[in-house]
Amino acid sequence: MKTLHVQTASSSYPVFIGQGIRKKACELLTSLNRPLTRIMFVTDEEVDRLYGDEMLHLLQEKWPVKKVTVPSGEQAKSMDMYTKLQSEAIRFHMDRSSCIIAFGGGVVGDLAGFVAATFMRGIDFIQMPTTLLAHDSAVGGKVAVNHPLGKNLIGAFYQPKAVLYDTDFLRSLPEKELRSGMAEVIKHAFIYDRAFLEELLNIHSLRDITNDQLNDMIFKGISIKASVVQQDEKEEGIRAYLNFGHTLGHAVEAEYGYGQITHGDAVALGMQFALYISEKTVGCEMDRKRLVSWLKSLGYPSQIRKETETSVLLNRMMNDKKTRGGKIQFIVLNELGKVADHTFSRNELESWLNKWRLEETS
């Protein structure tokens, strides 16, 4: 088991990473020295089917536990589901010494975390991610639900009290979910660690990744994320760099319809556009064709649907949280492993997006 410590302006908490950690859940939670009267255990339908009863029985050995299951997929991050979980917490007689455990992927973590942040003005919250994608979202304290006009527009910054990351769960993931999570690992390498990126470029099949490689990738990815969050907890500066690939990615997700494309596939599209615009506007030197070819070889899409209009995507991007005064703050690379933000007008970005789309279809 590996342990990382995240220190932010508002809190400090451990991240436990390793195989079989779920079996030590009671021991690890007790080690936090937090008063725990009751636990609401939130999971999704798919994770519940595979591991829900096992985790419920483990936790019930020590505390009163209420299990609440939400639909699998992005549709669970809704105000309706948020209200349902608040009602479940009230009916279960949760108090300020109670705790919510998010047992699932990023959707469950975002939803359950936002409930914890707002129930009785904030109660303890534990992340137990079960996907590779959630290695990114479980650390850093961003919790939210979606609005029909945009992703993650209603939320808060609320740090967990601990993250328990059992890597055994990742071996049961379908390949599309493994690929989705790998996109965030790749993002971390693009923006902060060129040597790590070179390591990743040697991977040609996601199913050939060994347990040791997987644990190492997760540890490096979380270490990069933790380092950024420690310096900028509430995205007032460098934390925005973690949105590399996400400005277009979120627009594509929203326009296709949540659940119609995985978050990682959408971010991979966004990163390919970000590489293009980094090369064309700030002169980032790289072998872009090699990078794009590698992403394609791992199964990531390289083109936006032809029927999706560029102007519609720009409308989505104008609603992005990084937009200021009608200008879009877009995360670019000065060089591989070194990131910066760049401001574009709507017309500028629309022009570059049209040029990139034309290049990808030629």
UniProtKB/Swiss-Prot annotation:
GO terms for biological process: amino acid biosynthetic process; aromatic amino acid family biosynthetic process; chorismate biosynthetic process. It is an enzyme of class 4 (lyase). Gene3D superfamilies: 3.40.50.1970, Dehydroquinate synthase-like - alpha domain. GO terms for cellular component: cytoplasm. Pathway: Metabolic intermediate biosynthesis; chorismate biosynthesis; chorismate from D-erythrose 4-phosphate and phosphoenolpyruvate: step 2/7. SUPFAM superfamilies: Dehydroquinate synthase-like (SSF56796). This is 3-dehydroquinate synthase. It comes from Bacillus subtilis (strain 168).
